[in-house]
């Protein structure tokens, strides 16, 4: 017959508790790391939406306006300036 003492049982329960707690802490760190990566990707997306896209729009619109202005305005001659 096997004698099981309370200290042995507590030691096994303690080991199981330690393993479960270690896995939970590891999962928390993994989830935090994945959330950080997701946040960085979202910030890069916002950078594209709020910085790169508007600047490209302003550049293209300015170029269009310059072309239309150049076509409609008659260049002045030097005789007009003197």
Swiss-Prot record:
The gene is E. Keywords: Apoptosis, Host Golgi apparatus, Host membrane, Membrane, Transmembrane, Transmembrane helix. InterPro entries: E_protein_bCoV, E_protein_CoV. Residues 1-16 are virion surface. Homopentamer. Interacts with membrane protein M in the budding compartment of the host cell, which is located between endoplasmic reticulum and the Golgi complex. Interacts with Nucleoprotein. GO terms for cellular component: host cell Golgi membrane; membrane. One of its GO terms (biological process) is disruption of cellular anatomical structure in another organism. Gene3D superfamilies: 6.10.250.1810. The keyword Iron-sulfur does not apply. HAMAP family: BETA_CORONA_E. It is found in: Host Golgi apparatus membrane. CDD domains: HKU1-CoV-like_E. Pfam families: CoV_E. The chain crosses the membrane at residues 17-37. This is Envelope small membrane protein. Plays a central role in virus morphogenesis and assembly. Acts as a viroporin and self-assembles in host membranes forming pentameric protein-lipid pores that allow ion transport. Also plays a role in the induction of apoptosis. Residues 38-78 are intravirion. It is a single-pass type III membrane protein.
């Amino acid at each position: 017959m096997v004698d099981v003492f309370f200290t042995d049982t507590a030691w096994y329960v303690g080991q199981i508790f330690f393993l479960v707690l270690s896995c939970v802490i590891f999962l928390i760190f993994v989830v935090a790391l994945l959330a950080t990566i997701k946040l960085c990707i979202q910030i890069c997306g916002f950078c594209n939406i709020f910085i790169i896209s508007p600047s490209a729009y302003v550049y293209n619109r300015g170029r269009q306006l310059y072309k239309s202005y150049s076509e409609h305005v008659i260049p002045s001659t030097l005789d007009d300036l003197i």
